[in-house]
Each structure stands twice: as C-alpha cells, then as structure tokens.
C-alpha cells in the first residue's frame, strides 16, 4: 500500500515537472515568434497583440524572474523548486534558440550563452527563493532581496529621479509581491 502511494507521488512529480518544461518550451517558441511578428493593425488578432504589447513583455527580464519565482515558491520542497525552475528554463532557452536557428536563419550564440548561464544557476537561485515563503528572519531577508531585484527591474532610479519603466513592469512587480506574500496552499 505504501509503495503504491510513493509511486503515485513520484508519477505526479514527473508529470508536474514535465508540464513545467512544456510550459517553458511553449513560452520560448511564443516569445521568439512574437519577436519576429510584424504587427499589421488591419488584422484583428495582430491589432490585439499590438495593444497588449506582448512582444515587449517577453523581452523583459522581470517576466522571466516572476515566472521562476512563482514556480519556486509554489514547489513542495526546495529541491523540487530547483528541478522545476531548471526544467522551465531549459525548455524556454532551448526552444527559443532552436526556433531562432530553424526559422529565423541565424544563431545568436553569444546572446544565448547568457541565458544558458542563467539556466545553469537557476536551480540554486530557485532553491534559495523557495525559503522566501517562510515567516522567519531568513525568509524576510530573501523576500527583501527578491523584491529589491524586481524593484530595480521595474523602476528607473537615480540620485535625482524615480520613474516607472512601464505599466507592465509595475504589474510584474505587484504580482511578485502577491506571489511572495500570499500563503501558497497549493504546491506543484
């Protein structure tokens, strides 16, 4: 009876991780497709894409950080957080890179090396981010560091000025606050 339960749990972990990987693949392809799409306002669905400005949203570092933070915080354990975030970024970066090579006719290797490097360190960062959902001092420090990074990603800050980069950046920042401070009941 206990071994059957463990098999079911392991099967669910594998399925969840595969779905996260697939989500990364889909977002990688969608992101590159949007990069190459020239918007024609006379076509209704392209007009909507132009209004939503999605091609710029997926060019922001903040959206990718938000997705990784969300996956990490909603994972059951820090180890699962690392595995899930690694699989997400593997799916996203490899599909983006392959789409660029196969359909765009060029290989942005130097640019992709930055993302591959980020992918390699993402499990460690996810492992640490998982602890942000706690109630102790360490969790508060981790949450503060995450929010600081997202704050810098969302706002222009200087000695004499403070300005919002865009409404999308503000929404990403607000969503990060929600993800970090709402108690996650359902985990992946």
Regions found by a protein language model. Give the residues of each.
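Membrane-water interface at the C-terminal end of transmembrane alpha helices
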Residues: 16, 124-138, 176-188
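Terminal transmembrane helical module of multi-pass membrane proteins
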Residues: 141-188
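Lipid-exposed faces of alpha-helical membrane segments in multi-pass integral membrane proteins
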Residues: 19-26, 87, 91, 95, ...
